[in-house]
Amino acid sequence: MRINGDIGVISDTHGQVRPEGQSALADCELILHVGDIGKPEVVDALTGQAQVVAIRGNVDHGDWALAYPETQELTVNGLRIQMVHRQQDIPTLLPDRSCDVVLFGHSHKPFSETREGVLYFNPGSAGP
C-alpha cells in the first residue's frame, strides 16, 4: 500500500472516539487501530476521517468483531508493519517478526522501543 500522508496509530478506544483522539488523527491518511475497539461505530467514525486497518482485542466480542483479525500484517510505503493487541502474544502470534514495526496495545501505557532494528510501539489507551 502506498500513501502520501501520515499514519496514525490508536488503541483501546473501548467504544468511544474522544474528540482529542479524532483531532490528533485529523491529518492522517491511514489509521491503524490495534484492538479493543469496543463497538463497530468506532471504526465507522474513524473511517470517516481516513482509511482504517483494525484488529480485534480482548474486549471485542460478538458477530461484528469477527470482521477483524487477531493480527494483521501490512506493508506501507515499503515499511513492514505487524499488528497484535497484547504484547505478551507477540512470541506466539507473531513468531516470525521479519518486519520493521510491531504495533500493540492492551496495557494502556504508551511504549516505544527499538530492538534489533524493529520498532515496538504502543500508543497507549485512547478510551475510558
Feature locations, PLM:
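Conserved beta-sheet core of the metallophosphoesterase superfamily
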Residues: 53, 80-82, 87-128
